[in-house]
Regions:
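Transmembrane beta-barrel strands of outer-membrane/channel proteins
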Residues: 48-52, 78-80, 113-121, 169-175, ...
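Exposed, low-structure sequence patches enriched in small/polar residues
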Residues: 43, 48-51, 239, 243-256, ...
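Residues that define the transmembrane beta-barrel architecture of outer-membrane proteins
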Residues: 42-44, 56-58, 92-96, 143-151, ...
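Flexible loop and strand-edge segments within Gram-negative outer membrane beta-barrel domains
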Residues: 84-99, 114-164, 172-184
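Repeated loop/turn-to-beta-strand initiation elements of outer-membrane beta-barrel proteins
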Residues: 71-74, 108-113, 160-167, 197-205, ...
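Residues on the lipid-exposed face of transmembrane beta-strands in outer-membrane beta-barrel proteins
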Residues: 62-66, 76, 100-104, 151-157, ...
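Outer-membrane beta-barrel translocator domains and adjoining extracellular loop/strand segments
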Residues: 88-91, 123-132, 178-186, 214-222, ...
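Outer-membrane beta-barrel translocator/receptor signature
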Residues: 29-30, 39-48, 52-98
């Protein structure tokens, strides 16, 4: 190929002129704009319900707390109801109670204490007092009263923490005294803790116990303690939690199932669930007298077992404050106490324990 001639590039030069022009500029004055404050929602801190019915029955129910409860809450609750009938001698009743409560919110933990006093009085009913002589049934033999003094301290976390831990617990004490000389002291406690892993898995355990000491006329001391380990999985709209509830009741060991399964079909509005829960229910005067206050002094107190089997259920909440819960299942009781008239005094009841 022929050799091409290479020419040197032509030299080029440029002349750039620079000119500066000063222009005065005054920005518009910045004025702060205030957004209109929204009126805070008024929250009631005083509640009072009062009424009056036939048989000279006054009803009072009240509650009062401090107005700003963001950091702490202190309050007082009370209730009272009684009846007074002229034509039915000694067949009236009275129920009253007052509770002082307080709780304090730390950064992520809430602690609180309740102190209460209850006085309930019941007169025997269901008989015609005109058929019996006054010497047999007088005012002192036709009523029974219950006085309860108790307190409860509790704690729980109400905010998320770096370790994804949830925990809560309580310790309670109740002293019950009857006007026939019987008394009962109850101590109960529970502690629950759980941890979440990878926003899917949950593992935890709960320990709880109850100690009942009854003087009637001898001494009857009973202690129940339970331990419940559990684990769960949560994936989208489905959640399942299962474990075992192991209970020691006066030296006897019982193992119950613990299973909760739910499917959130429509968030908060339609939830399908089924459950299988078992436990030992404490049977004492404190838990029984509100169902039947006429309890014999000759009762042999014993606890009973329960199993709540919910085969299928639907629950949810609808706008407007309406909620529903419909389920199909069965309750299974073992050693269930049934009230039976005492043969020595028809005004009192003892127990017949049904095996199943």
């Amino acid at each position: 190929m022929p050799k091409l001639k290479q020419d040197d590039p032509t030299k080029q030069s440029y002349t750039v002129s620079e000119k500066s022009i000063e222009i005065g500029y005054k920005p518009a004055e910045i004025k702060p704009l205030k957004v209109k404050d929204e009126e805070p929602e008024p929250l009631p801190f005083v509640y009072l319900k009062a009424g009056f019915g036939n048989y000279l029955t006054p009803v009072i129910d009240f509650s009062i707390t401090n107005k700003n409860t963001e950091k702490f809450k202190v309050g007082l609750q009370g209730d009272f109801i009684s009846s007074k009938r002229k034509n039915y001698a000694f067949q009236d009743y009275l129920e009253s109670g007052v509770k002082l409560f307080g709780q304090y919110n730390f950064k992520k933990v809430l602690i609180g204490t309740d102190v209460k006093f209850n006085f309930d009085k019941y007169n025997f009913y269901g008989y015609d007092h005109l058929l019996f002589p006054e010497e047999l049934f007088d005012k002192d033999t036709m009523d029974i009263s219950y006085r309860t003094i108790g307190f409860k301290s509790y704690f729980s976390n109400y905010a998320d923490n770096s370790k994804d831990l949830k925990y809560k617990g309580h310790l309670g004490f109740n002293q019950l005294k009857l006007n026939d000389g019987r008394s009962e002291n109850i101590i109960d406690f529970s502690v629950l803790a759980s941890k979440k892993f990878k926003d899917i898995f949950t593992a935890g355990a709960q320990i709880s116990g109850n100690s009942t000491s009854l003087k009637s006329p001898g001494v009857n001391n009973r202690f129940v303690v339970g331990f419940k380990p559990f684990a769960g999985v949560e994936m989208g709209i489905w959640r399942i939690e299962g474990g075992a509830n192991v209970v020691i009741d006066e030296g006897d060991v019982f193992a119950f199932p613990y299973l909760k399964n739910q499917l959130e079909i429509v968030p908060t509005k339609l939830v399908m669930y089924n459950e299988w829960l078992g436990d030992v229910s404490v049977n004492n005067i404190f838990n029984t007298y509100t169902k039947n206050p006429w309890l014999s002094q000759n009762i042999m107190w014993d606890n009973y077992k329960t199993e709540d089997r919910r085969f299928i259920g639907l629950r949810g909440a609808i706008t407007g404050g309406f909620s529903y819960d419909v389920s199909f299942g069965q309750m299974v009781y073992k050693n269930m106490p049934l009230f039976v008239n005492d043969t020595t005094d028809f005004r009192k009841f003892t127990f017949n324990y049904e095996e199943k």
